[in-house]
Amino acid sequence: MEFGLLSEAEARSPALSLSDAGTPHPQLPEHGCKGQEHSDSEKASASLPGGSPEDGSLKKKQRRQRTHFTSQQLQELEATFQRNRYPDMSTREEIAVWTNLTEARVRVWFKNRRAKWRKRERSQQAELCKGSFAAPLGGLVPPYEEVYPGYSYGNWPPKALAPPLAAKTFPFAFNSVNVGPLASQPVFSPPSSIAASMVPSAAAAPGTVPGPGALQGLGGGPPGLAPAAVSSGAVSCPYASAAAAAAAAASSPYVYRDPCNSSLASLRLKAKQHASFSYPAVHGPPPAANLSPCQYAVERPV
C-alpha cells in the first residue's frame, strides 16, 4: 500500500526522486540543455559556408578605403606644408574645414608627406656625397691642365730660361766703348762647350756682327743692346765679332760660370780670329827663276 502511494507521488512531482535510503535528488532543468543546444547550432551555422551574411561580416576584418584628393585639396595641403611641416591640432582642424576633409585624413596626409620629404632629402645627400667622391676614386687625380691651367707641358723650358733674364734691366748701356771690358769680364758666361760651339760661326765670318735676331736666338740678348751700337763697334774694332759673341754669351741664362773656362774660351776665340784676319797682298809680276840677286833687285818694281 505504501509502495503504491510513493509511486503516485513520484509521478506527480517528477523533480523529486527518492533513493533507496529515502533522500531526495534534484533533477537538472531542461532549459539549460536547450541553451547549450542553441549555441552549438549557432557555431555550426557560422562554420558552414551557407551561413547568414551578418555573422560573416562581423568576423571579417574591416578594410580601409584610400582617400582620393582633388587638385584644390592637394594645392591647399602642399601650400600649408611648405609653410609648416608639423601643424598642430588647431591648424589641422582649420585645414580640414578649408579642404572639406576630416582631421584624421589631414593628419595622415601630413605624416606621409613628411616621410616622402625625408626620403628625398636622404637621396639628395647620398647623390652629393657620391658626386664628391666620384672624381678622386674614378680618375684618382684630375688632369694637370685642369688643376693648373697656366702651366702646360710645352711651355716649361721657355718660361724657365728666357723670361727671367729677358725682363731684367741693366744699369749700363752697350756701346763701342764699354763692349771691350764686358767681353773680357762677362757677367754671365756659358760653359766651355757652348763657347766652343760658337767659335766656328764667329771664325767663318770675321769682321761681321750677327744681327739682333741672332743675338736673341743665342741667349735672348738684353734689351739695352741696340743694333746701332753693335754696328759702330764693328766698324771701329777689328775684333767686333768676338766682342759681340762675348756680349751675347754674357746674356746667357747660365748664372753659375767657371772663370777659368770662360777666359780660356775667349782667348782661343781671339787667337783664331786674329789668325784668320790678314791684309790683302800686293799682286805683282812673278820673279824670274834665272835672275841673279842683283838683277832680281833691279827688276823688282819699287
Swiss-Prot record:
**Where is region (Disordered) located?**
1-71
Its principal location? nucleus
Tissue specificity, per the record, is: Highly expressed in developing eye lens.
Point out residues bearing the modification Phosphoserine.
52, 57
The entry's family comment says: Belongs to the paired homeobox family. Bicoid subfamily.
The disorder this protein is implicated in is:
Anterior segment dysgenesis 1: A form of anterior segment dysgenesis, a group of defects affecting anterior structures of the eye including cornea, iris, lens, trabecular meshwork, and Schlemm canal. Anterior segment dysgeneses result from abnormal migration or differentiation of the neural crest derived mesenchymal cells that give rise to components of the anterior chamber during eye development. Cataract 11, multiple types: An opacification of the crystalline lens of the eye that frequently results in visual impairment or blindness. Opacities vary in morphology, are often confined to a portion of the lens, and may be static or progressive. CTRCT11 includes posterior polar cataract, among others. Posterior polar cataract is a subcapsular opacity, usually disk-shaped, located at the back of the lens. Some CTRCT11 patients can present a severe phenotype including microphthalmia and neurological dysfunction.
Name-wise, this protein is Pituitary homeobox 3
What organism does the record attribute this protein to?
Homo sapiens (Human)
